């Protein structure tokens, strides 16, 4: 969407997602509590998805601007593949991704991103990023919503991992607080396989700019405007 590929519009019978891909829509932050609740049948009180994705986006924003700059100037110098490596976050049994709302993983990402930004700033001191920021701001890109515009498959994989970890944390908390019995927890763990299905149902119509634009195009295509 941001690179404005030709003929991807309603006039050419192609619906624009107004994100990188439709998978980004499934990762909309405001719907992820519901995803985890449908999987576990519990209320999410252990993780703030909105804050996590806002922080994640803010960390990536300046580096993403550099990436967009090079997509127009010379893609080889900062390729899609190289940028996509920054979408993944560390997750281990010793340091679960969701601990402290992802703070440890986000701090590690921030350090990696800052190193790359400093390197690019030194190597290309005359790059005019202000023009790039303004150009893409007009298309809807802001520091808190970068996750809509990065590669959807990578983002979806990340959010799937986060949701799985959140569901496990919800179940552990419920068991610890004796909200559920052991048998109920076992049954809920068996149901965790439904997470991918539930994540793909995460569409919040009318809730944010890209989906509203897509809905508008569908109405136009159907002649309802």
What are these regions (language model features)?
Residues 1-225:
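Acidic, divalent-metal-binding catalytic cores of TOPRIM
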């Amino acid at each position: 969407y941001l690179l404005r590929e030709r003929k991807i519009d309603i006039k050419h019978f192609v619906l624009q997602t107004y994100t990188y891909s439709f998978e980004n829509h499934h990762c909309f932050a405001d719907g992820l509590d519901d995803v985890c609740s449908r999987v576990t049948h519990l209320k999410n009180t252990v993780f703030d998805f909105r804050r996590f994705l806002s922080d994640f986006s803010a960390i990536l924003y300046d580096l993403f601007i550099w990436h967009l700059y090079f997509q127009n100037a010379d893609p080889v110098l900062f390729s899609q593949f190289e940028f996509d490596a920054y979408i993944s976050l560390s997750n281990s049994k010793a340091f679960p991704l969701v601990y402290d709302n992802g703070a440890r993983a986000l701090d590690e990402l921030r350090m990696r991103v800052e190193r790359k930004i400093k390197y690019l700033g030194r190597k290309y001191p005359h790059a005019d990023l202000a023009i790039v920021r303004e150009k893409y701001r007009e298309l809807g890109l802001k520091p808190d919503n970068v996750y809509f515009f990065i590669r959807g498959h990578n983002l979806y994989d990340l959010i799937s991992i986060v949701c799985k970890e959140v569901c496990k944390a919800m179940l552990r908390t419920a068991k610890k607080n004796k909200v559920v019995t052991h048998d109920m927890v076992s049954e809920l763990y068996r149901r965790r396989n439904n997470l991918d299905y539930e994540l793909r149902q995460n569409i919040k119509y009318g809730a944010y700019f890209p989906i509203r634009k897509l809905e508008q195009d569908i109405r136009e295509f159907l002649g309802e405007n």
